[in-house]
Amino acid sequence: MTDLVVTGRGSAPVADLISSLTRDVADFPKPGIQFKDLTPLFADREAMAAVIDALADIAAGTDLVAGIESRGSLVAAALAARLGTGVLSIRKSGKLPPPVLTEEYDREYGAASMEIPADSLELRGRSVMIIDDVLATGGTLGAATRLLERTGARVTGAAVVVELTALRGREAIAPLRVHSLSRA
């Protein structure tokens, strides 16, 4: 994977590009949380292309890209189009018709659950790379891994745009192999 990208802004490491286009929002969605708003990054054509290029190097050779709703699914769809693979959106509970497989987990700011279709996909034996926007506590990636493994999928790893290292999410989901494009 090349770490240096050339954009209209000149040459810069992918991590620097991500950092420059990430907006920190204090006390959102609740007091004490420092939210990473990646909207400016995703809206920038060159930056989004650089992110997808970097992720394509990481996810090459996988059968399926699984994105965690909502921003992880946005990135996963673009990545799957680039790789020529399928994409699966791991949805928040209540967004899919039954039957579904559900996995509960804890987030940095509360408990939640996620779902995938229970009977309309054949994932057994397929290699899957999980994509999300931010790795915080590891709750979301851990739940997505458990959910996919219940189907018989072979989770080859996860990739995130930003990793919040102080929250030690990587340690919480070990031994899952995690690739982060930038760390904060």
UniProtKB/Swiss-Prot annotation:
GO terms for biological process: adenine salvage; AMP salvage; purine ribonucleoside salvage. It is found in: Cytoplasm. It is an enzyme of class 2 (transferase). Its main location: cytoplasm. Pathway: Purine metabolism; AMP biosynthesis via salvage pathway; AMP from adenine: step 1/1. It catalyses: AMP + diphosphate = 5-phospho-alpha-D-ribose 1-diphosphate + adenine. The keyword Transferase applies. It holds the Pfam family Pribosyltran. GO terms for molecular function: adenine binding; adenine phosphoribosyltransferase activity; AMP binding. Belongs to the purine/pyrimidine phosphoribosyltransferase family. PANTHER family: ADENINE PHOSPHORIBOSYLTRANSFERASE (PTHR32315:SF3). Catalyzes a salvage reaction resulting in the formation of AMP, that is energically less costly than de novo synthesis. NCBIfam families: PRK02304.1-5 (NF002636). This is Adenine phosphoribosyltransferase. The gene is apt.
